[in-house]
Amino acid sequence: EDNSSLMEEHKKKNVVGVTYKTVNVAGESGDASPSTPIGVNLPNANWIRASIGSKSVSLGNIIHAYNNSGSSGRLKEFANDDQEYDLEIEHGQLGDKLHTALHEVVGHASGQLNPGVGQPKETLKNYSSTMEEGRADLLGLYYLYHPKLQELGLVEDWKSVGMAAYDGYIRNGLMTQLIRLELGADVEQAHMRNRQWVSAWSYARGKEENVIEQVKRDGNTYYNINDYEKLREIFGELLRETQRIKSEGDYKAAQDLVEGYGVKVDQEIHAEILKRNEQFTGAAYGGFVNPELTPITDSEGNINDIEVRYVNSFEYQMMKYAENYGFLVED
């Protein structure tokens, strides 16, 4: 908190009660299934965060599954060069894990509201979710490219990990996440919006100095980071502004940032991305098959064990859910 790029009046004076754990989940339900988040940070109330603290949980086996579920073909297609590809292969998973941890633990826990300012859901309204996710992302990005990570023993090569993380964030925010959208659609989901407005604003902010370069080669578009140090400064500048928006409850600034950079999609690039992605069979979103957990009881009904059995397929799971738990009345 003390070393972040936030304005002094927006920094917590006394950071308390920040805890972090990684757990493996046996199954999920509700809005966490079949497509799940990779981490959870609570509480949502900022006054509780300020006075008591916050707790973060990363879902370790979920992160591992996401990282190992796809091939490297899509990366090869959208990475600008061999260096970007090799950095992602060697350091990308660790960079992603660290970004998730920094996002959840430090990002959501950082900063404070100005006295008398309401909760973001009241002041920033429909932009509160994407603004908060972007703010947490930016805090993580700001510290991902820093030697302190190596001093703490978290990485062996902080610069390579940071470069891989920055490459991946820009590549996803400006290109690869667009495979989830139909051509002509706006970006609606809060996390997708925040990744786009963070990336697009940073690209625009550094355009004069060519910090991030748009490369056209053989009819394809790529993005290449020419100056990682400068990009970190830009992330810090945007972090400072997003915290100001939250701390002051500046709805107009949030609206301008999100609508200006996070909603509309460059249709020409979008069409190109979808065309280049046609060669890959992997789905745009990941879904999970939950095991069936059956209690094993003794003659008195006491549970002695749990039998874990996986169903035949994702499709079978969803049909069984509809059969057993589809309680909505159909006309």
Describe these PLM feature segments.
Residues 141-245, 251:
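Long, well-structured alpha-helical subdomains associated
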Residues 1-86, 92:
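Contiguous, non-catalytic segments that form substrate-binding/exosite surfaces or channel walls
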Residues 1-37, 215-331:
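Non-catalytic terminal regions of proteins
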Residues 129-146:
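An active-site-proximal "capping" alpha-helix that borders the catalytic cofactor pocket
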Residues 70-82, 104-119:
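Active-site-adjacent bridging/hinge elements
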Residues 95-112, 136-137, 141:
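Active-site recognition of the HExxH zinc-binding catalytic motif
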Residues 5-10, 118-123, 149-167, 253-258:
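Short, glycine/acidic-rich hinge or "gate" loops at secondary-structure transitions
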Residues 111-134:
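Post-HEXXH active-site segment of zinc metalloproteases
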